[in-house]
């Protein structure tokens, strides 16, 4: 269990204590840290929906430091980012790998950023199957469908053609922030807060 700091905000009406993530949420900042699973995705989706309800015309900032995770969990975040009205600006801090990189590239065009020493990694979805031959065939067909879906979206987001994405995601493909910018996963490498 990691330590979560609290901050105290003083107002004319007294003091209020927030955990740091709740305080950042007041500034429309969502932190996506660690592995992406159903619990993390549910929290991020809820925060996106809450911030849209608060102000549908104001950008949301999604900071990403993630090794990736479950494809379906990540897709729930992706779909929500596209469903809500506000632009979602994505910023890589540390690393955005696998589904983390996919979500980084899914930010609003022109608003996808990385800090200079971050690393970004894309690859094909991982999976495993056990059971009877028919069950394994079903799972193989589904992972191929997910791979094609993800590659199609990445092609659209980066401006790369589908064949290039398919080749470049065949194995782990690590990029610096500058390389990710040239590739089209992000729009700009930033060193100072805008």
Swiss-Prot record:
Its main location: cytoplasm. It is an enzyme of class 3 (hydrolase). The active site is at 98 (nucleophile), 123. One of its GO terms (biological process) is protein quality control for misfolded or incompletely synthesized proteins. One of its GO terms (cellular component) is cytoplasm. One of its GO terms (molecular function) is ATPase binding. It catalyses: Hydrolysis of proteins to small peptides in the presence of ATP and magnesium. alpha-casein is the usual test substrate. In the absence of ATP, only oligopeptides shorter than five residues are hydrolyzed (such as succinyl-Leu-Tyr-|-NHMec, and Leu-Tyr-Leu-|-Tyr-Trp, in which cleavage of the -Tyr-|-Leu- and -Tyr-|-Trp bonds also occurs). It comes from the Bacteria. Keywords: Cytoplasm, Hydrolase, Protease, Serine protease. InterPro entries: ClpP, ClpP/crotonase-like_dom_sf, ClpP/TepA, ClpP_His_AS, ClpP_Ser_AS. It is found in: Cytoplasm. Its EC number is 3.4.21.92. Fourteen ClpP subunits assemble into 2 heptameric rings which stack back to back to give a disk-like structure with a central cavity, resembling the structure of eukaryotic proteasomes. NCBIfam families: clpP, PRK00277.1, PRK12553.1. Belongs to the peptidase S14 family. Cleaves peptides in various proteins in a process that requires ATP hydrolysis. Has a chymotrypsin-like activity. Plays a major role in the degradation of misfolded proteins. This is ATP-dependent Clp protease proteolytic subunit.
């Amino acid at each position: 269990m990691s330590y979560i700091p609290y901050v105290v905000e003083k107002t004319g009406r007294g003091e209020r204590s927030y955990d740091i993530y709740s305080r950042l949420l007041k500034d429309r900042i969502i932190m996506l840290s660690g592995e992406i699973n159903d619990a993390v995705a549910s929290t991020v989706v809820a925060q996106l929906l809450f911030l849209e309800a608060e102000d549908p015309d104001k950008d949301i900032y999604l900071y990403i430091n993630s090794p990736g995770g479950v494809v379906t969990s990540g897709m729930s975040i992706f779909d929500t980012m596209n469903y809500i009205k506000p632009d979602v600006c994505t910023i890589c801090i540390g690393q955005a790998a696998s589904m983390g990189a996919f979500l980084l590239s899914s930010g609003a065009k022109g608003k996808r950023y990385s800090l200079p020493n971050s690393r970004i990694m894309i690859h094909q979805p991982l999976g495993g199957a056990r059971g009877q031959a028919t069950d394994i065939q079903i799972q193989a067909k589904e992972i191929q469908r997910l791979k094609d879906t993800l590659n199609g979206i990445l092609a659209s987001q980066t401006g790369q053609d589908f064949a290039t994405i398919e080749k470049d995601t065949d194995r782990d493909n690590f990029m610096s922030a500058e390389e990710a910018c040239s590739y089209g996963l992000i729009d700009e490498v930033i060193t100072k807060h805008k």
